[in-house]
Regions:
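Aromatic/hydrophobic pocket-lining residues that form the small-molecule binding cavity
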Residues: 32, 86, 158-161, 190, ...
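Carbohydrate-interacting/catalytic domains
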Residues: 1-48, 54, 87, 92, ...
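Active-site-proximal helices and loops of the catalytic beta/alpha 8
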Residues: 180-262, 292, 309-339, 344, ...
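Hydrophobic faces of well-ordered beta-strands that scaffold small-molecule active sites
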Residues: 14-16, 47-49, 100-102, 177, ...
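Substrate-binding/active-site clefts of carbohydrate-active enzymes
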Residues: 2-14, 21-27, 37-45, 51-172, ...
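Active-site clefts of carbohydrate-active enzymes
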Residues: 257-280
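Conserved short secondary-structure transition element at the edge of the structured enzyme core
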Residues: 290-308
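Short, solvent-exposed turn/loop segments enriched in Gly/Ser/Thr/Pro and often Arg
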Residues: 48-61, 103-112, 180-186, 209-214, ...
Length: 425
């Protein structure tokens, strides 16, 4: 069985998250567009654009505001450029063979959104009849006071929300959505809209910021976040857990989703800005974990700047240029993306091979993935000490990074330097 309507074009795809504001000194669509050939050469498949919409001025945070305080779902932030500028990105990306998904914000809007004035019933209100910002399960503010919480008991609001999504599918031919805070929106909304959206574009891709397994099990999304595993990886990098903790995720968490994909990552816009870059959180281990998330059975994500690399936290409400210069990790990511494209063992979900653990060890995470005669062996020392493991079968092939032949006979010792990795094809 193939994952819930996973588009064939996504079977061996990766995702690259684009932060337009910080991508170039100018922070515009037109300047980002110049990077498209470079990203194509790096093997990027899906461009996920953080919100590109106008940002509300009312209750704005910082000098530029949050990308997620949207004032108009059918327009673009004038600081980024015009709708036609963005459409030019979509068209060139498609010409290059890449797909485009938009970051959608279904849980709330900015306070300048036209619905605030024309349809106040579209929003959650307190006992005094005032529109509220998003509240937690205890009725307390979540601290997002720059946005107004939408009321999903209002069916007209739901209809308009879907209509705005369809606008982007029909008028601008985007390829899908990443839904912000999808876990805060009722499940039945997703069950309803997936049918409506697929009636417009049958092969769209849907990603949820969520770890609710029913978002996959109930055929609402193709992929959700692998947050639990990500936090485990951070803990391993910091010496708080051992590599064997990954087995626990596969044993107890992964099986709760009977279908679909987990998006795996070492960074994203939230993690970078609020918890630190992958270099800050993972130190010398950051490349080892990048190898891991790009070879596991989820769909991998790379965040803007990781190919530089970028050690700093990007400001969220202010201008803070990534500062691209040398793209020192571009070849590293190109090798990983190329292997995923070319070797069906690493394809996504049921298109690819399952994880088969080998050489089980507390500190070295090793596995094989096989599909239709194709095989990839991954061996990673996830510790800051030298480790030696014993091969439980013959291993022969070529390491994709060094280009050197690798051969271990059954019961042979394999020694690895701290955070060393081998990806053998």
């Amino acid at each position: 069985m193939i994952d819930f309507n996973l588009p064939e074009w996504a079977k061996n795809a990766n995702i690259y998250e684009v932060n337009i504001r910080q991508y170039t000194p100018e922070g515009t669509f037109n300047e980002f567009r110049k990077h498209l050939p470079r990203l194509k050469k790096m093997g990027v498949d899906i461009l996920w654009f953080m919100p590109i919409y106008p940002i509300s001025e009312t209750k704005k945070k910082g000098s530029l505001g949050s990308y997620y305080a949207v004032s108009d779902f059918r327009n673009t932030n004038p600081k980024f450029g015009s709708l036609s500028d963005f459409k030019a990105i979509i068209e060139e990306a498609h010409t290059l063979g890449m797909k485009v998904i938009l970051d959608w914000v279904p849980n709330h809007t900015g306070w300048d959104h036209v619905w605030i004035k024309n349809h106040p019933d579209y929003y959650t209100k307190d006992a005094a009849g005032n529109i509220t910002d998003p509240l937690n399960e205890h009725g307390q503010s979540m601290g997002w006071n720059d946005v107004a919480d939408l009321n999903y008991d209002n069916m007209n609001m739901r209809d308009e929300m879907v209509s705005d999504m369809i606008f982007w599918l029909k008028e601008h031919q985007i390829d899908g959505f990443r839904h912000d805070m999808a876990l805060l929106v009722p499940l039945d909304f997703w069950q309803t809209i997936i049918v409506k959206l697929r009636a417009v574009k049958h092969d769209l891709f849907m990603l949820a910021e969520s770890e609710i397994h029913d978002h996959l099990n109930q055929d609402c999304f193709h992929a959700i976040y692998g947050w639990s595993l990500h936090h485990t990886l951070n803990a391993i990098a910091q010496g708080k857990k051992k590599a064997s903790a990954i087995d626990e995720w596969y044993a107890y968490d992964r099986p709760k989703a009977s279908k679909g994909l987990f998006m795996q990552f070492t960074s994203n816009h939230d993690e970078n800005s609020w918890s630190g870059s992958e270099i800050e959180r993972m130190g010398e281990a950051h490349k080892a974990f990048a190898v891991l998330v790009n070879t596991l059975d989820g769909i991998p994500l790379t965040y803007s700047g990781q190919e530089e690399p970028m050690p700093k936290r990007l400001e969220f409400f202010e201008k803070d240029d990534i500062g691209f210069k040398n793209y020192n990790y571009a070849d590293f990511y190109t090798k990983l993306n190329t292997l995923k494209h070319d070797n069906p063992a690493l394809w996504n979900g049921n298109y690819g091979g399952q994880i088969k653990r080998i050489m089980k060890d507390d500190n070295v995470f090793s596995f094989i993935r096989e599909k239709d005669g194709n095989k990839v062996t991954v061996i990673i020392n996830l510790s800051k000490q030298k480790q030696t493991v014993v091969s439980d079968d013959d291993i022969n092939g070529t390491d994709i990074f060094s280009g050197k032949k690798v051969s271990f006979a059954k019961r042979a010792e394999c020694s690895l330097a701290p955070w060393e990795y081998l990806v053998i094809k």
